[in-house]
């Protein structure tokens, strides 16, 4: 299971959700879904990480690592 820090990170960076969506090339509705905990495709996750100048693993964290 993935835990998303996307909303917190975007808020901390002072960015508008629509700005991030436009830079990534996704619809605002898709961005809203991701902000509410939806899972992105790998390509979208990579693009978001690039826009935020972060690694994908810093935005979406695997919660079940202890059971692997």
Language-model segments: residues:
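Residue-level signal for the short linker/turn that defines the boundary of a DNA-recognition helix
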Residues: 4, 14-15, 40-43
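Residues in the helix-turn-helix
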Residues: 19, 30, 58
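Short, basic-rich loop-to-helix N-cap that marks the start of a DNA-contacting helix
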Residues: 37-50
